[in-house]
Amino acid sequence: KNAINPELVAGGSSGGSAVNVAKEYTVFSIGGDTGGSVRQPAGYNKIYGLKPTYGRISRYGLMAYASSTDCVGPLAKSIEDIRIVLNVMSGKDTKDQTSITSTEISEKSISNNTVKTVGYFKNFIESEAINPQIKADFKATIEKIKAKGIEVKELDFFQSDILVSTYYTLAMAETASNLSRLDGTNYGNRIEAENLKETYAVTRSENFSEETKRRIVGGNQVLSQGFSDEIYLKGLAIRDQIAENFKKDFEEVDIILSPVTPNNPPKIGDSLKDPLAMYLSDAYTVGFSLGQLPTLTAPQGTATGLQITAAKNNEELVLQFANFLKELI
């Protein structure tokens, strides 16, 4: 249940982590963010949540969902706690070959704002799908930023439906591959049946949730013969275009600002009735995941917060700007 309104969802999949922090059961918590699963719950529960640069924090010990975008990130009520936990968790790990070395972020380095230019995606804000109040609140935040002498630029980006479909095409394909080992032979809870084939079927049918099974079936479909070239490989090509788009954007701006979600948190149970609506709630988070960029949810600016994104390996600038926004809004 949401920490602020128990009739609303806490967000997923790290909703429990976010609620624990929001209710002050813990000083910080750790979540997994593949397409927004740290950032969305952080926004829904009005705390900070960071998805770091892909590879900055080791994924060793994390159950793999979509390996190309899986990240581990901290959630906390203060920017300083985010900084401390990030420093402790960051670094190269021999048990995760995708992990990278990184420099420690000092308290002093994030105390003064050095951001000169901020960008935002016009199509996110002008979308018909965005809640009018979130749109109005975001625009008001932009005006406050301009009033402080920071240049703000409108940026072009991929449409939300393309981002969501690309993300779920790749994520489902990787999910089908990653979870294929959970058949009860070496991994997973085994449920015996009359023969081996039925044992596999019952084990996977009973142990996976409906949503997990939906994603596995979707992943197997896009990887199957006749679909792979048309769907999966096209998804990979679009992901490369997204990364190139971000590279050009960060030649023009220091930070990209966006809402975390286009709408307010739904009531408990509503998302299960409409899986498509649930997927579309990720419209503003998945693009940054595909770009493997550092992105922080800050609990200001709109009903579900603001996303602050910088170029790869620039978490310091993200935290800097979060401190600036905290004082501004």
Please place each PLM-identified region on the residue numbering:
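Short pre-catalytic strand/loop immediately N-terminal to key active-site residues, enriched for Gly-Thr
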Residues: 1-12, 275-278
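Structural helix-boundary/capping segments
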Residues: 23-28, 34-128, 139-148, 217-245, ...
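Serine-dependent amide/ester hydrolase catalytic core
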Residues: 126, 160, 183-287
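General small-molecule cofactor/ligand-binding pocket signal
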Residues: 151-156, 296
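Charged, often glycine-rich, active-site loop that binds/positions anionic groups
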Residues: 165-178
